[in-house]
């Protein structure tokens, strides 16, 4: 598939209206973004964009949506993996002059009204999670109605589609069913920042044999990566507390555990009191509190959020000045995703990793803590296999406990 070199005057006007609303007067699509948008104006286009965080992948699908809607096309369906990411995308779409909504577990009471708006043509963009996409009821109510009238399908974080991906999610496989049932003229865009060559090839193959792959360098020139290892836990806390005032702007300090995040916040407050505003951000907070803290960081009301991995993919603050890791992330891909929060709209941002030999033991614990005991599992399977009738959970647990007591 060869991408058209330019947009028509009407298409360019629609794209410019979105970009200037999002990025200010005079903002325009870059040539590499324009290539992707131009390709998506062709009926049946299949485009895979593999670009670094901060490249502006969302600008591509907002612009393409505006062009398609201006030409009388149907709405855009975006498959997105995180509630926080969907919330930010809805807000961005509104800033770009597009009507958008999401169907997720936090707004069940709004589903009927949103689906009615969708059927009435009042929505430009609908965002759903892969889990919602895999729900049979959602398929009957929404997908069947949309399949013949969808203007654009966007698969965000598309590496999760691939069996070879670092973050494979089985529910993303439902995308293949959606693709099969789509009107063949519906364009499809898949985006990711963390796909190696094998994952890229796998995702492209699932999209179709004529997929246009637009892959750029994943290095971020604005990020200055530093590593300081060999510090004890107390020394790492001290480094953060002492260095925080000198770090540029506001940012994120990543901790490996909830307890570490809470202790580090206490350590910073012990040194600076109320002079440096910080807060802990973990998965144990309710959605409203997490949203409140995300907004506080976005508008620089805090110097830093001390966060677990609960704050990661999908959080978009273009002027985030630094990311500090107190402990090594579980993988290079996780590290790349987390440091990618910084410096999106800055020439320079600071990234610091405070590594320790004990970090590997923490991740080994996380990886094995939920694995059941092999002997107990064998006993349970044997009990099920030997039973002549259905067994209650209580009976099965008794069987397992009795086996533990055997000499």
Please place each PLM-identified region on the residue numbering.
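Helicase motor core with emphasis on the C-terminal RecA-like subdomain
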Residues: 41-42, 47-48, 52-55, 66, ...
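Short acidic, hydrophobic short linear motifs in intrinsically disordered regions
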Residues: 389-397
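Single conserved hydrophobic/aromatic residue that forms the stacking wall/gate
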Residues: 398-407
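Conserved pre-motif I regulatory segment
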Residues: 7-48
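Conserved SF1/SF2 helicase motif Ia
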Residues: 63-90, 96
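Hydrophobic positions on the alpha1 helix immediately C-terminal to the Walker A/P-loop
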Residues: 60
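Short amphipathic alpha-helical interface segments
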Residues: 372-390
